[in-house]
From Swiss-Prot:
Mn(2+) 1 binds at residues 8, 10, 41, 197. Binds 2 Mn(2+) ions per subunit in a binuclear metal center. It catalyses: UDP-2-N,3-O-bis[(3R)-3-hydroxytetradecanoyl]-alpha-D-glucosamine + H2O = 2-N,3-O-bis[(3R)-3-hydroxytetradecanoyl]-alpha-D-glucosaminyl 1-phosphate + UMP + 2 H(+). The lineage of its organism: Bacteria, Pseudomonadati, Pseudomonadota, Gammaproteobacteria, Enterobacterales. Its cofactor is Mn(2+). GO terms for cellular component: cytoplasm; extrinsic component of plasma membrane. Hydrolyzes the pyrophosphate bond of UDP-2,3-diacylglucosamine to yield 2,3-diacylglucosamine 1-phosphate (lipid X) and UMP by catalyzing the attack of water at the alpha-P atom. Involved in the biosynthesis of lipid A, a phosphorylated glycolipid that anchors the lipopolysaccharide to the outer membrane of the cell. This is UDP-2,3-diacylglucosamine hydrolase.
């Protein structure tokens, strides 16, 4: 009995090996799990559920098949795919969760989230995030013709890469106070997130207990998952 967590696959047509690795993971690992949680950035970008890109239909079919075989799949939006909506969720059989969610697994209460909200030192990004998560701005963007949305998304990705290249590693990592506040706010001693692409298990000292923050790795040259069982919480890398 196990529950699996993944994040930061950044699936795109430009990286077919990662897509193949994900599909293999679904067939080899996820099919045997109690549930699969995807903690954001499943896709490199997402400009709306009406995008006819065949890759998205392929991924949706694989996830739907998983659900039909009795393995539920849950999704928390990332900073790349925050516009993924109900239409794709229904097509893929995924359940959309709030940006911070507590799950109880095998006697543990675990806070799960993408992780970008913990990076509070990156004030430029947090201001940008607040704007693009405005429901009115999202609605206006989705009204724009698909071709123009594609161009806007490409421009924003390039701008983001340029901005990040000039930022320090410290600014782009989580803020310690934000982490502790999240633990205390949700009254948990376990946390799993992605976003930073810095896989590790960290101990965090809270007033009454030592908590654990598990960071998923990105799927660049290998896969990364967290496997939670009754006995253990493991951070695992594996070849595609």
């Amino acid at each position: 009995m196990s529950t699996l967590f993944i994040a930061d696959l950044h699936l795109s047509v430009q990286e077919p090996a990662i897509t193949a690795g994900f599909l293999h993971f679904i067939q080899r690992e996820a099919i045997h799990a109690d549930a699969l949680y995807i903690l954001g950035d499943l896709f490199e970008s997402w400009i709306g559920d009406d995008d006819p890109e065949p890759l998205y239909r392929q991924v949706a079919a694989a996830l739907k098949s998983l659900q039909q075989q009795g393995v539920p799949c849950y999704f928390i939006h990332g900073n790349r795919d925050f516009l993924l909506g109900k239409r794709f969720a229904e097509e893929s059989g995924m359940v959309l969760l709030p940006e911070e969610n507590v799950v109880e697994l095998y006697g543990r209460k675990i806070l799960i989230l993408h992780g970008d909200t913990l990076c509070t030192d990156d004030t430029d990004y947090q201001h940008f995030r607040k704007k693009v998560h405005n429901p009115l701005i999202q609605k206006l963007f989705l009204w724009i013709p698909l071709r123009l949305r594609l161009r806007i998304a490409a421009y924003m990705r390039n701008k983001s890469q340029q901005n990040n290249s000039g930022k320090s590693e410290h600014i782009m990592d989580v803020n310690s106070k934000a982490v502790i506040d999240a633990f205390l706010r949700h009254d948990v001693s376990w946390m799993i997130h992605g976003h930073t692409h810095r896989p590790a298990i960290h101990s965090v000292e809270l007033p009454m207990v030592t908590a654990h923050r598990v960071v998923l790795g990105a799927w660049h040259v290998e896969g990364s998952m967290v496997k939670v069982t009754a006995d253990n919480v493991e951070l695992i890398t594996f070849p595609f």
